[in-house]
Amino acid sequence: MLDITMFSKADSVKGQGVGSAYLELMRLLRTHWQDEFNIKVNRYGHAAISHYHTVNPMFYLSTFMPNRGRKIGYVHFLPETLEGSLKLPRPFQVIFNRYLISFYKRMDHIVVVNPTFIPKLEAYHIKRADVTYIPNFVSKREFYEMTKAKQLRLRQQYGYDQNKFMIIGTGQIQDRKGVPDFITLAKQNPDIQFVWAG
């Protein structure tokens, strides 16, 4: 049995995509691989693999411990993708950005959830061979196509045209989530309902 320690505070803020992805991964591991993996969360004892989901300072310090095993880091964001979402005074933003990249450089291997992050990580002198793209898991229990009747009920409940085609965007309201493009498309296509939930 492989000893894995998950380091995460991703589920401490409800509704965050990072938290949802982490919880879904944990559910999958515990459901399908409980006989292969001994998973602990936020423990500082020996581990063959330490899997970092969030960049908390205590987790960063743990990367210097000799018993961490292979350090794997999930990269959900980069300094440039936080612009407009993390509001810090300029000097603190610079310090945080350096800390973030330093955290990522402490990893033996990095998993990105967005393939566009790979060349950006290379620009920070992280080797391409040390980066793997794996998209987030999506729970089919929570995300599924609704019946037509339920769609119509929700359209009526929220005051949307029953007959107009609708495009829905979800996520935090940030440039990196594509909000400006979404708004541009909405302006160019007034015959379509554009709704952003997040």
Label each residue range with its predicted role.
Residues 106-115, 132, 195:
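A short beta-strand/loop micro-motif in the catalytic core of glycosyltransferases
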Residues 49-51, 65-84, 111:
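Active-site proximal beta-strand in glycosyltransferases
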Residues 39-59, 72:
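Short N-terminal targeting/anchoring amphipathic segment
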Residues 91-110:
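Membrane-proximal helix-turn-helix segments that form the acceptor-binding/catalytic region
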Residues 1-47:
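N-terminal pre-catalytic "stem/leader" segment of glycosyltransferase-like enzymes
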Residues 155, 161-177, 183-187, 195:
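Conserved donor-binding/catalytic core segment of Leloir-type glycosyltransferases
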Residues 116, 137:
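Carbohydrate-associated surface elements
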Residues 122, 138-156:
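Acidic anion/phosphate-binding donor-loop and adjacent secondary structure
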